[in-house]
């Protein structure tokens, strides 16, 4: 699905940019034919989502070990993604850029099951945890200018801050008595925050409207780590965005 989104957005943007250039007639000046050196600012907005993951782990409940199953809630883990950045272009082909990115929260659904306590034969409980995400990155960008158009690839590192919001898994415990006795259970999971330094990469195409203003469409990815049921879990963060650059 992600591949289709990237291809579709890129193709649409490229068609729109090309159509706009043709509609304006022949281009007398290529805005890429300058020294290219100087500072610039950039803003991006678009669509973010995380990869689907699932996993199993063991948790302690009243002194008894239960099985916890976790999986990504892909429907809720997608939405608005935004980034602001400042950079310096050494020439038309290479620049350094640092930015702050807000990611749409990720969600994981969890449930626990098993036997607990001598008086209870089975326990079933479930819940949903929200993961808030933002990052600060440092990226190197290689650009290939083609008249007023340009293509670019970028790579670097991102510090990703995550906050796992506290939540409660609720459900029932059923005793082996006759008749069975059903009781409510609640497993509270506290909030936690962590920071990660992870690789980030991106690719995109753009068009220089003037010597100072450019628009682009791009895809970027922060490579996560760990399994979804581990304490060091960070999902892969994907974003498809439209960008606007102003060159000083």
UniProtKB/Swiss-Prot annotation:
It holds the Pfam family OMP_b-brl. Gene3D superfamilies: 2.40.160.20. One of its GO terms (cellular component) is cell outer membrane. Keywords: Cell outer membrane, Membrane, Signal. SUPFAM superfamilies: OMPA-like (SSF56925). InterPro entries: OMP/PagP_b-brl (IPR011250), OMP_b-brl (IPR027385). It is found in: Cell outer membrane. Residues 1-23 form the signal peptide. The keyword Membrane applies. This is Uncharacterized protein CBU_1260. It comes from Coxiella burnetii (strain RSA 493 / Nine Mile phase I).
């Amino acid at each position: 699905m992600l591949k289709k989104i990237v291809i579709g957005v890129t193709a649409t943007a490229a068609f729109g940019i090309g159509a706009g250039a043709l509609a304006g007639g022949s281009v007398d000046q290529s805005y890429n034919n300058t020294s290219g050196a100087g500072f610039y600012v950039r803003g991006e907005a678009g669509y973010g989502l995380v990869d689907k993951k699932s996993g199993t782990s063991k948790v302690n409940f009243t002194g008894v070990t239960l099985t916890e199953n976790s999986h990504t809630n892909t429907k809720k883990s997608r939405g608005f993604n935004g980034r602001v950045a400042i950079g310096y272009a050494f020439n038309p082909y290479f620049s350094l850029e640092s930015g702050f990115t807000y990611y749409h929260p990720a969600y994981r659904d969890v449930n626990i099951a098993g036997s607990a306590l001598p008086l209870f034969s089975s326990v079933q409980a479930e819940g949903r945890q929200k993961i808030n995400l933002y990052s600060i990155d440092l990226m190197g960008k290689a650009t290939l200018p083609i008249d007023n158009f340009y293509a670019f690839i970028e790579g670097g590192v991102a510090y990703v801050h995550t906050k796992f919001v506290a939540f409660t898994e609720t459900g029932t415990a059923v005793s082996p008595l006759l008749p069975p006795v059903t009781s409510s259970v609640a497993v509270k999971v506290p909030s936690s925050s962590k920071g990660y330094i992870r690789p980030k990469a991106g690719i995109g195409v753009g068009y220089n409207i003037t010597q100072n203003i450019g628009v682009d469409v791009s895809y970027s990815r922060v490579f996560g780590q760990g399994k979804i049921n581990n304490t060091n879990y960070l999902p892969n963060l994907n974003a498809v965005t439209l960008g606007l650059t102003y060159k000083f």
